[in-house]
Amino acid sequence: MLLPVFTLKLRHKISPRMVAIGRYDGTHPCLAAATQTGKVFIHNPHTRNQHVSASRVFQSPLESDVSLLSINQAVSCLTAGVLNPELGYDALLVGTQTNLLAYDVYNNSDLFYREVADGANAIVLGTLGDISSPLAIIGGNCALQGFNHEGSDLFWTVTGDNVNSLALCDFDGDGKKELLVGSEDFDIRVFKEDEIVAEMTETEIVTSLCPMYGSRFGYALSNGTVGVYDKTSRYWRIKSKNHAMSIHAFDLNSDGVNELITGWSNGKVDARSDRTGEVIFKDNFSSAIAGVVEGDYRMDGHIQLICCSVDGEIRGYLPGTAEMRGNLMDTSAEQDLIRELSQKKQNLLLELRNYEENAKAELASPLNEADGHRGIIPANTRLHTTLSVSLGNETQTAHTELRISTSNDTIIRAVLIFAEGIFTGESHVVHPSIHNLSSSICIPIVPPKDVPVDLHLKAFVGYRSSTQFHVFESTRQLPRFSMYALTSLDPASEPISYVNFTIAERAQRVVVWLGQNFLLPEDTHIQNAPFQVCFTSLRNGGHLHIKIKLSGEITINTDDIDLAGDIIQSMASFFAIEDLQVEADFPVYFEELRKVLVKVDEYHSVHQKLSADMADHSNLIRSLLVGAEDARLMRDMKTMKSRYMELYDLNRDLLNGYKIRCNNHTELLGNLKAVNQAIQRAGRLRVGKPKNQVITACRDAIRSNNINTLFKIMRVGTASS
């Protein structure tokens, strides 16, 4: 049984996911955590009653070994580590929705303080790719930025949605770190510097990421799922009714391999095998876990796993010895395991009893009479599954239809479908009433996104009189673009927006790609190039035209820029295309973007004006306060009252101005997100180097406020003529 080697109770509440540990003087490890009052506390039990100079840091009135760092804003992310290798000690990085602070705790001074327009939702510190100096990488409003120790912006790119989690991991085994990004659009993206090298789609918002070892990493979702990936392959995952607040990799059983440590919202901490997800250790706190870190907190040469709760309770655990391996859990946990095994035993005994009763019934009854009740079906019974596109009717919207049928007169009593990202809870049960039983069932499926999905099916097959059923299991993949129906050619419906590119592939290979990614009717015959196919979206009725010429030139007509990007990325993956330059034009979308850019300029102007007004008000407040105090000292009560009335009015104006600034900032963030997403979409229309060039050139055009150049880059992929 593994017990904590130390326990602390700090009188400060800790914000979830905002705990870090660092050697801020180069020697002593100290905990840093954000509070809910716009402060960061630093717990240093090694040098008590240390003198603190007057700056951001002041001594906590509650505890002598806790110093408080005033941020005066809600802290949104926090980490610690070596930012400047020449200093020889760690820096503290604190992010808010408007700024990033790099703080030198030892000298009580700012390393840099940068305004970040896209906010900082997540932060990670380390080296990325071939960039030699350590970077503080922040993820915000669809954007990623990396700053060195001087505050210089050395890395910038965009991603598909608001960033929630970041981690650095050697994903491809080349000895250099790649950036893992988890975002609100359920995707985990892997950046090799500014190039996306892999994408994994999950079922919910990705809230946490952590490197395990090599190319293996852990992840957590907002629906209570935690798991482990090795590159793009998921090893395992489990789902809990509680939320995973923090995950961390730590070798708790001393077997040389890191386990996945998870802190939960109900106060539980558990350690799971990286290979199987089996729980090897767990403990409970009285409140939710805020963060999990590691460090030699006792300065005895041994690294401890340090778990912190939101109420300020801190426990440190030493890894188990070789003798304790496999016995890290307490007796209550072992009793839980015994109960679980007993339940499995009961289930097996019940199954055995069913077999025995079947055998007795077979001896006591004529064969045919007993068959139906026992669920015996013909040996040649087969389960058939087909996928097709249904345009819907008055009572049902358009959908993809899954038809499940048997090969004889047996009936399907129930169907269980397990699929990620389609059904609530990832499962769906179809259980027809006793009067509607038949040998086939049609199930409507409406995937919300264009991603391939594996449907895992379990069908209960028997006869109407059966009390026991045979279970058929099957797996069927839903194609990526299953929500698009093949339609007849209609030049009048051709969208004006298009992308155009050339690939060195035979037309027949493109036909194979179409067959794998769309649900084409069985009687569909596509002639050799040149040819054209037309589809209609089942979601919004939008049109999609794909034209292929003999030369390998492909034109895709659609008004949906996201769909065009998905098709290009799908083709690039199928045909193993490394670099692809594309010409694109989306007039309606570009006009909407132009309006957004005008709004961004307007909101920036309003922000500057409001800031100037606030500065003027601040100067006026000083003069009014001095005047009011002078009048009080001179016992001129009438003038004093007049000055304080003016102060009251000025204070009201300041509050109103603050509300306007908040609304203006919210609107500005929304429009900046739209701009960043537009750059990301323009990048997704290309592959490889052209993609990176478009993203970089778009950012340069926005920096120089050259809107016409921006749209030219989005259309042709370059600013040069």
From Swiss-Prot:
Tissue specificity is: Widely expressed.
Give GO terms for biological process. adult behavior; artery smooth muscle contraction; brain morphogenesis; cartilage development; cerebral cortex development; cilium assembly; fat cell differentiation; gene expression
Task: Report which residue ranges the record marks as coiled coil.
Answer: 325-369
Localisation:
Cell projection, Cilium membrane; Cytoplasm; Cytoplasm, Cytoskeleton, Microtubule organizing center, Centrosome, Centriolar satellite
Keywords for the protein's UniProt record, in alphabetical order:
Bardet-Biedl syndrome, Cell membrane, Cell projection, Ciliopathy, Cilium, Cilium biogenesis/degradation, Coiled coil, Cytoplasm, Cytoskeleton, Disease variant, Intellectual disability, Membrane, Obesity, Protein transport, Retinitis pigmentosa, Sensory transduction, Transport, Vision
Give the matching InterPro entries: Bardet-Biedl_syndrome_2_prot (IPR016616), BBS2_CtH_dom (IPR055381), BBS2_GAE_dom (IPR029333), BBS2_hp_dom (IPR055380), BBS2_Mid (IPR029429), BBS2_N (IPR029430), BBS2_pf_dom (IPR055379), WD40/YVTN_repeat-like_dom_sf (IPR015943)
Entry's Pfam families?
BBS2_CtH, BBS2_GAE, BBS2_hp, BBS2_Mid, BBS2_N, BBS2_pf
Phenotype when changing residue 629 to K: In a patient with Bardet-Biedl syndrome compound heterozygote for mutations in BBS10; uncertain significance
Q: Report the GO terms under cellular component.
A: BBSome; centriolar satellite; ciliary basal body; ciliary membrane; cytosol; membrane; microvillus; motile cilium
Disease field reads: Bardet-Biedl syndrome 2: A syndrome characterized by usually severe pigmentary retinopathy, early-onset obesity, polydactyly, hypogenitalism, renal malformation and intellectual disability. Secondary features include diabetes mellitus, hypertension and congenital heart disease. Bardet-Biedl syndrome inheritance is autosomal recessive, but three mutated alleles (two at one locus, and a third at a second locus) may be required for clinical manifestation of some forms of the disease. Retinitis pigmentosa 74: A retinal dystrophy belonging to the group of pigmentary retinopathies. Retinitis pigmentosa is characterized by retinal pigment deposits visible on fundus examination and primary loss of rod photoreceptor cells followed by secondary loss of cone photoreceptors. Patients typically have night vision blindness and loss of midperipheral visual field. As their condition progresses, they lose their far peripheral visual field and eventually central vision as well.
Name of protein: BBSome complex member BBS2
Per the UniProt entry, what species is this protein from, by scientific name?
Homo sapiens (Human)
Q: Which gene encodes it?
A: BBS2
